[in-house]
Curated annotation (Swiss-Prot):
GO CC term, one of those recorded: cytosol
InterPro entries, sorted: aa-tRNA-synth_I_cd-bd, aa-tRNA-synth_I_codon-bd_sub2, aa-tRNA-synth_I_CS, aa_tRNA-synth_I_cd-bd_sf, Glu-tRNA-ligase_bac/mito, Glu/Gln-tRNA-synth, Glu/Gln-tRNA-synth_Ib_cat-dom, GluQ/Sye
Subunit structure: Monomer.
Motif mapping: 'KMSKS' region: 255-259
Name listed for the protein in its UniProt record: Glutamate--tRNA ligase 2
Protein's organism: Rubrobacter xylanophilus (strain DSM 9941 / JCM 11954 / NBRC 16129 / PRD-1)
HAMAP family recorded: Glu_tRNA_synth_type1
Length: 496
């Protein structure tokens, strides 16, 4: 490949369902490689599997890529010099390429029925040979006779005439030299009996027509590579470079799936992972970046990306590391941004009334400023912010008895309630001064009042700073909750 050629890479998914995290990582590696080298990133939709490909999946796929922050220079919605970018709209291109291969003798019409193919493979197994189809009588059939049968409407496929000797070898940027014995590769189908192309044929033709310089894809495609190389050579194409990215596995070293908690972009979005955090984490996963840092902007990741540094071993997905990165990105968001994220969640979960949230957005901004250091997922927000809204709380019985069972607390909580109620200003400083003042009068550490007061006002034993929290909960709610605790203490039979 000429060194002066502009880098052109493609991400070419089949739209058959949600976008798996392994596919997103492959897309990211293509995008990073293109951006690093000032190249072109192409999105190509490989939708020739008409039974499984759906328009809904195409749209979902594009949404997922855009959500995580990927843009494409050529492809659906943006066009480009090699349009169209959906394989079902490029069928004539594949048929022309097939005719060229037929005319050159590199391919042939195959009329074998499914029953013939089954018998061929059974016989090969019985004779101790690999069940590899090599064309039978059709491989060397007179081209004129084959064409006559085609014109008569006889069902057929078009197969590649695989060399029976030698090896097909390529240099994988990630794995090094990879080779296949040609004798182990059967005469593979190029065009199905329906006239639609197979994956290998369409991919090779498209890669050449779109001038792809580097094919960066999952390692489940390694066995496809010799077939595509054969097609390229038979058509006189310049070969792209190949790099096969290992799979993403769960901690149990099995392919990451829903049983591990999340597997698709949508899963992670639904579980409160920010797009920039998922981008950052997946770009680092098995990519060979120096371990001294973990948080990078996309431009920094592209600048540091080295395809040859990508590990040849499967990448093990570490949810805790992703959550740690996600927490960093949550902390980097402004309280205003977090409030915009939080409002619909709080309303949908029934934590707060939509009208109240809209009327008092500045308060929600302050709540998010208080809570953001404690969040790992955005979906933590409704639980974390719940005690700022509503009136009375549901208290855990065991913890209630632990917090209010001590004589000092029972004796002094009523006085604390009276002093808090009498405060002229409901501010964190005023609340703190009140609590610490009473504790000092009683010659006790402030913690003897702070812990039960936290539980009374939030229903939690752990929260953000108590006094700031009480200020934001508000005087009315705090006093109502403390009064509720006092009433329960006076009436032990009252249910929690």
């Amino acid at each position: 490949m000429e060194a002066s050629r502009q880098v052109r890479v493609r991400y070419a998914p089949s739209p058959t369902g949600r976008l798996h995290v392994g596919g997103v990582r492959t897309a990211l590696f293509n995008w990073l490689f293109a951006r690093k080298h000032g190249g072109v990133f192409i999105l190509r939709i490989e939708d020739t599997d008409l039974e499984r490909s759906t328009e809904e999946s195409v749209e979902q796929l594009k949404r997922s890529l855009r959500w995580i922050g990927l843009d494409w220079d050529e492809g659906p919605d943006v066009g480009g010099p090699h349009a169209p970018y959906r394989q079902t709209e490029r069928l004539e291109l594949y048929r022309r390429a097939a005719r060229r291969l037929l005319e050159s003798g590199a391919a042939y019409y195959d009329f074998a029925t499914p029953e013939e193919l089954t018998r061929f493979r059974q016989r090969a197994r019985a004779e101790g040979r690999p069940p590899i189809y090599t064309g039978g009588p059709y491989r060397e059939m007179d081209p004129e006779e084959a064409l006559r049968r085609v014109r008569m409407g006889e069902p057929h496929t078009v197969r590649f005439k695989t060399p029976r000797e030698g090896r097909t070898v390529f240099e994988d940027i990630i794995r090094g030299p990879v080779g296949f014995e040609n004798a182990t590769i059967e005469d593979f189908v190029l065009l199905k009996s329906t006239g639609t192309p197979t994956y290998n044929f369409a991919a090779a033709v498209d890669d050449a027509e779109m001038q792809i310089t580097h094919v960066i894809r999952g390692d489940d495609h390694i066995s496809n590579t010799p077939r595509q190389i054969m097609i390229h050579r038979a058509l006189g194409h310049e070969l792209p470079a190949f790099a096969h990215v290992p799979q993403v596995l769960g901690p149990d070293r099995k392919k990451l799936s829903k049983r591990h908690g999340a597997a698709s972009v949508e899963d992670f979005a639904e579980q409160g992972i920010l797009p920039e955090a998922l981008f950052n984490y997946l770009a680092l996963l098995g990519a060979g970046y120096a371990a001294d840092e973990e948080i990078f902007a996309p431009e920094e990741l592209a600048e540091r990306f080295r395809l040859e540094k990508v590990s040849g071993n499967p990448a093990i997905f570490d949810e805790q590391k992703l959550l740690a990165i996600n927490a960093v990105y949550i902390r980097r968001k402004s309280p205003e941004e977090l409030a915009m994220l939080a409002a619909p969640m709080l309303s949908e979960r029934g934590v707060a009334d939509a009208g109240e949230l809209e009327r008092d957005m500045p308060r929600l901004v302050r709540i998010m400023e208080l809570l953001r250091e404690r969040l790992q997922r955005t979906t933590d927000i409704p639980e974390a912010a719940g005690y700022f809204y509503g009136e009375r709380l549901d208290y855990d019985r065991e913890q209630f008895e632990k917090q209010f069972g001590k004589e000092f607390v029972r004796e002094n909580l009523p006085e604390l309630y009276r002093r808090l109620k009498a405060l002229p200003e409901w501010t964190a400083d005023a609340i703190e001064s009140c609590v610490r003042g009473l504790a000092a009068e009683k010659e006790k550490g402030a913690r003897h009042l702070i812990h039960p007061l936290r539980f009374a006002t939030t229903g939690r034993t752990v929260s953000a700073g108590l006094f700031e929290t009480m200020e934001l909960i508000g005087r009315e709610r705090c006093l109502l909750r403390i009064a509720d605790v006092l009433e329960r203490l006076q009436s032990p039979e009252r249910s929690l």
